[in-house]
Each structure stands twice: as C-alpha cells, then as structure tokens.
C-alpha cells in the first residue's frame, strides 16, 4: 500500500526507521550503482547554479556521490556538507569522499543555524520525507537570503518504469504490506511541486523534466538494479523467503515486456528538477 499523503494509519516515525534500515543495508551497493543516476546529478547541479566559494548542503546525500560532484564546482574556497539519516550511507561517503564534510541529520530537523548555506541540494530524496512541507521549510531556514535550493523527485508512476515495473510486480505477486508507505511518486506533478515551494515561502519556483535512460540485458539484471536503489523496500524484501524472491525476480519480466528492445530492455524514466530561491529582504 502506498499513500499520496499522510493518512491516519501512517506512522512517520516508523517509516523513517524502515527507510534508514533499508538504506543502511544497501549502502555499498547503492554507491556502486551510481552510474544509473549520473545524468541526473549533472542536471541537478547545473540547475543549482553553483559557483566558487559557495557553501553547499546536500540532503539525503546517501553515499555522497552528488556532494562529491558538487565540490569541484564550488572550488576554490567552497565547502560541501553531505547529510543523511542512514549512518552506513555516511560511512560509505566518508570512506570514498574525505574532502567533503558529513553530518548525520533528519531533514525535517536540521542541526544547522539559520542562513548558513548558499545552496541546498536534495537529489531524489524529498519524497522520502514524511512531511515534505516541513523538510522544505528547513531547507529555506538554512539557506541564505538570495540563496537557492535544487531538488529532484520522480515524476508520475507511468513515467518512471525504472521503479514502477518492480513496484507493479510486487503489487501483483505479494499481499498488501501491513505498514502503510508513502508513494515515491507523490510529488511527481510539476504544478503541485511548484505550489509546495511557493507555499513554503520560496520565490521563483521553476520545474523542468530530465530523462534518465537505462538498459538491462535480462529481468534479473533489472531486478538487482532495483534492489540496489530501493531503500526501505530492499529491507522488507530481504526478509522474504528465497523462493518468493526468485518468483519476483523472474516475474518482473511481465512488467518489463513493453520495454523489450532487441536482446534487452530499454527504459526511459522521467525526473522533475525543481529550483526556488529565498528572497532577499527588501
């Protein structure tokens, strides 16, 4: 079960615990699968308008790949802080990217003083915050007047086969989960996303679309790629019996069938990239 907004049976604290545990479980594999998201990193950094000397916060940074990619853009004199709730993700980042700073933090309660960053980034993370309005308010609080945020989120489910094929397979073959979950596509409407930014007090909201191309030789390759990105879902799946996991791995071929191209599968997924500014005092 997924929800498009918090419902009475949704437990935000438990959701965070599940996501944290799931991402801790896949930290090393998530970093290794970074090539799948390289074009998204470039597009988000381009939209952010980084420059030398800026101080940058990367929220939901995971293994620090986006944060590390930002560092050359703010050099010389710049500083990048990678922040995440999952400590294993941060440990992976520290081991691979010693030149950036790290802070374990909940994006809905950031441990930073007001107005201390020139830019705040959040790549494919905002939809995992149970209270996205609170997370955006925290981004606005810690960014300087005249500063900017740049976030990316998955578009609507039909436009994201990289994720939706696996989720559809799970809905078809597994019983409904006992714990309500937020949909990773819940911020996939451009107008809604821009409206959220405006409602939080940001100015000049702008939303554009970026396409992500991915290819897989076999359903098994696709399924493993999904597991390497899936966070809380990966944690839940890891507790299933081996025969059920094998059924999912083979069964996803049904959902992938529309994307068969030659001897493999080619998927085009869409991501929304949104930017907005914190207005300077008049």
Located regions from the model:
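A short glycine-rich, Lys/Arg-flanked "PGG" loop and its adjoining helix->strand segment in the class I
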Residues: 133-148
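Conserved class I S-adenosyl-L-methionine
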Residues: 2-54, 65-69, 89-92, 96, 148-175, ...
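Class I SAM-dependent methyltransferase SAM/SAH-binding core
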Residues: 55-110, 119, 134
